[in-house]
């Protein structure tokens, strides 16, 4: 068992350095997350802890160890030793249950034009065809699908909103490429560019029962385990988001609202929403590079009924181009670069 970074063998009462195990009782590895990288050009490399990183129970001073020490060093009858052990394990299990409750998390990622290679009868995708202007081949498509899935897996949150996918076939390919056990929701919108939303979620954490979509927006409502009933509103337009928030508040006052995507047209304080990424924006961070500065194209707003734990831009070195100054775009104008996309994801933890 680990206490303050040291393994303690409760059988022989020996201390072992990190990374070692006793062989009789202790079988564990110490997980140590690597230091967060920092991207050049003004965007802080901000990461987040995965769900398992919050499961870090500290056993220092726990009665469990006192019971074992007392039992080994005194002439206590075996029955009392057994009772003491059982009590210790019960206290240990109760402590772990309390400490293991992770905060809830939501993320949003603009995949930056993830088209398939088949002509669409609904939208104008002629540029993104093998014979089109972008020379969008099957190999390039598969590479971007794998990169998008890697971003979702790296975020590792129960709710990950995705924008910029052409159809459900693309979403299905991304879900199949994900290593995490994600389910997905998809609805076709009436956008002129043929790009839609999808929601990737953990089926044991979120239980959706209502999905709606319209012109540059999509909502998914349901029970978020441990948080009650919530609704995630995703937006790809600053123009309509304020109206959609007010409409939702009128029609579903019992639902706690999460907003992700383009939110510049919203009035968060008037609508009972907090801005977890406000500090990051003031610090000059953003999701997309525009000339010599960063723009917060994607954002997250959280219902004030929740307490924000942390929110920021999600930046990793492999999401940046070789210069480290901007996100690694798939295309620069018409030149193929081979990156995941020109946008960085955003995320927020809340309780």
Q: What residue spans do the PLM features occupy?
A:
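Metal-dependent phosphoester-hydrolase catalytic domains
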Residues: 247-258, 264-351
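Bacterial Sec-dependent N-terminal signal peptides
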Residues: 12, 53, 66-102
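Intrinsic-disorder-associated, low-complexity terminal segments enriched in Asp/Asn/His/Tyr and depleted
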Residues: 1, 12-15, 24, 29, ...
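N-terminal, active-site-proximal structural segment of metallo-dependent hydrolase catalytic domains
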Residues: 67, 98-177, 189
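Structured beta-strand-rich core segments of catalytic domains in phosphoester-bond hydrolases
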Residues: 165-228, 235
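Compositionally biased, low-complexity flexible segments
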Residues: 23, 27-50
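Active-site beta-strand/loop signature of hydrolases that rely on acidic residues for catalysis
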Residues: 106-111, 147-171, 232-236, 241-270, ...
